[in-house]
UniProtKB/Swiss-Prot annotation:
Major location category of this protein: cytoplasm
Physiological role: The RuvA-RuvB-RuvC complex processes Holliday junction (HJ) DNA during genetic recombination and DNA repair, while the RuvA-RuvB complex plays an important role in the rescue of blocked DNA replication forks via replication fork reversal (RFR). RuvA specifically binds to HJ cruciform DNA, conferring on it an open structure. The RuvB hexamer acts as an ATP-dependent pump, pulling dsDNA into and through the RuvAB complex. HJ branch migration allows RuvC to scan DNA until it finds its consensus sequence, where it cleaves and resolves the cruciform DNA.
Naturally occurring in which organism (per UniProt): Methylorubrum populi (strain ATCC BAA-705 / NCIMB 13946 / BJ001) (Methylobacterium populi)
InterPro entries associated with the record: DNA_helicase_Holl-junc_RuvA_I, NA-bd_OB-fold, RuvA, RuvA_2-like, RuvA_C, RuvA_C_sf
Chain intervals for the UniProt region annotation (Domain I): 1-64
Name under which the protein is recorded: Holliday junction branch migration complex subunit RuvA
Gene Ontology CC: one annotated term: Holliday junction resolvase complex
Location in or out of the cell: Cytoplasm
Quaternary state and interactors: Homotetramer. Forms an RuvA(8)-RuvB(12)-Holliday junction (HJ) complex. HJ DNA is sandwiched between 2 RuvA tetramers; dsDNA enters through RuvA and exits via RuvB. An RuvB hexamer assembles on each DNA strand where it exits the tetramer. Each RuvB hexamer is contacted by two RuvA subunits (via domain III) on 2 adjacent RuvB subunits; this complex drives branch migration. In the full resolvosome a probable DNA-RuvA(4)-RuvB(12)-RuvC(2) complex forms which resolves the HJ.
Annotated spans, Domain II: 65-143
Keywords from the named record: Cytoplasm, DNA damage, DNA recombination, DNA repair, DNA-binding
SUPFAM superfamilies: DNA helicase RuvA subunit, C-terminal domain, Nucleic acid-binding proteins, RuvA domain 2-like
Superkingdom field: Bacteria
Length: 208
């Protein structure tokens, strides 16, 4: 089995790169995010590889990090998720973002992936929620905050601030993370903060 390839980028296809390794061209399928981060043809790169062997073919999947490869494997443990859908998810969410989205139950972020509808997004979140923190650090405060917003137990200024950031076009998981960071920075002052202040601080966090 091939676990890693290091070579020269030969050319690109719609969803793959041809990597020249000592004169042999390997077709390696990648997420759109990974393809965008690879160098131009003629330059060197390396990829972590997942090898799938079937009776009629051998297919290679490439990743910029071991974490991305682990998520590729984990996503496929959920019914209805094959290699194409797994790559689609990793095309819109990098590993840390995916871990946070699943840990906080942000089905909307997961559903942005091609081939993932609301029902499959809900299944992914439900089945992988307990496993997500093992793949990337997830802020417990963010998880608690997201749960409070969903349960309608979060202070109104907090809920309003998150809603405002979402209305500005930020994904739910990013909006929640920004407000969680703002609240942490306020310390004791978080108990009396107004929504407009949280929005301003949240935008500052998002701009970093």
């Amino acid at each position: 089995m091939i676990g890693k390839l290091k070579g020269i980028v030969d050319s690109y296809g719609e969803d793959f790169v041809i990597l020249d390794v000592n004169g042999v061209g390997y077709v390696v399928h990648c997420s759109a995010r990974t393809l965008q981060r690879l160098p131009k043809p003629g330059e060197a790169t390396d990829l972590a590889i997942e090898t799938h062997v079937r009776e009629d073919m051998i297919r290679l999947y490439g990743f910029r990090s071991d974490a991305e490869r682990e998520w590729f494997r984990l996503l496929q443990t959920v019914q209805g998720v094959g290699t194409r859908v797994a790559l689609g998810v990793l095309s819109v969410l990098e590993p840390a973002q995916l871990a946070t989205a699943i840990a906080t139950g942000d089905k909307g972020a997961v559903a942005r992936a091609p081939g993932v509808g609301p029902r499959l997004a809900a299944r992914l979140v439900a089945e992988l929620k307990d496993k997500a923190p093992a793949f990337a650090p997830v802020d417990p405060a963010l998880v608690a905050l997201t749960g409070a917003v969903e349960d309608r137990t979060a202070p109104q200024p907090v809920a309003d601030a998150i809603s405002a950031l979402v209305n500005l076009g930020y994904p739910q998981v990013q909006a929640s993370a920004a407000i969680a960071a703002a609240l942490k920075g306020l310390g004791d002052g978080a108990e009396t903060v107004e929504a407009k202040t949280l929005i301003r601080l949240g935008l500052r966090e998002l701009a970093r």
